[in-house]
Amino acid sequence: MSLAFTLLTSKDNTDEDEEHLELSSFNQEKLLEMISVFLSRLTRLNDSKQEATESDQIPLSPTSLKNPCLIFSAKNVPSISIQAYLTRILKYCPATNDVFLSVLIYLDRIVHHFHFTVFINSFNIHRFLIAGFTAASKFFSDVFYTNSRYAKVGGIPLHELNHLELSFFVFNDFNLFISLEDLQAYGDLLLSWYRQNGQNYNPTDVSCSIESPISHTPQQNQQDEQPRRPIMDRRLLSSHSIG
């Protein structure tokens, strides 16, 4: 059962006092913590599922544009926690709340696009995050940084980020548009879930070993046409979500 369905139909979330996340003013560090808690619990769940069903398999190197699990998988689980990774991204590549929240929605779309055969796990979550953030920053922001900066902040080679970003676009059907209503719905849902499930979370604050990036001048983004409006499924990483 999807997280969104669980929350929307539970008695605790049908009261008149509904949770509301103010996108423009919500504390960014708190938002990153909420996203991190959800993704950390999701990846642990999927890790255990894969260990039970694929105990004899190991992550493979990127070899195919058809399988995001292969393309985004690292050889080893990164030593930096999800929350520390997102905090690092925010520090060196500042962005608004809608950019970070949109990455969660894009991951949901990818999972749904591949008919729930994609596992968001500890081997691929960091690469999904940096690729999604790179794409979302260019779509939502008037200014953005070069891919060389995003790659350095993310701790991966530039050529690999370029490949991951293109794959991220492909897996989202080159459609990154998200309506304000859908952003708000996901934000409210995430806040509600966190207040019920995330209070006992203690993240492992592991610092990243790569050196701090140097300053780069942001590039202005020029959009000539309006993107088409997608049909939103409104499920948070539905295939393996946790309630």
Curated annotation (Swiss-Prot):
State the family named in the UniProt similarity comment for this chain: Belongs to the cyclin family. PHO80 subfamily.
Residue stretches of biased makeup (Polar residues):
211-224
What sections of the sequence does the record tag as coiled-coil?
none
The main location is cytoplasm
Q: Which domain of life is it from?
A: Eukaryota
Which terms does the UniProt entry file under GO BP? Answer: negative regulation of sister chromatid cohesion; regulation of cell cycle phase transition; signaling
Keyword Cytoplasm annotated: yes
GO MF terms listed in the record are:
cyclin-dependent protein serine/threonine kinase regulator activity; protein kinase binding
UniProt GO cellular component terms: cell division site; cyclin-dependent protein kinase holoenzyme complex; cytosol; mitotic spindle pole body; nucleus
Q: What does this protein do?
A: Cyclin partner of the cyclin-dependent kinase (CDK) pef1 (PHO85 homolog).
**Region of interest (Disordered), residue spans:** 211-231
What quaternary arrangement does the UniProt entry report? Forms a cyclin-CDK complex with pef1.
The UniProt keywords, alphabetically, are: Cyclin, Cytoplasm, Nucleus
Q: Which gene encodes it?
A: psl1
Q: Name it.
A: PHO85 cyclin-like protein psl1
Where does this polypeptide localize? Cytoplasm; Nucleus
Q: Which Pfam families match?
A: Cyclin
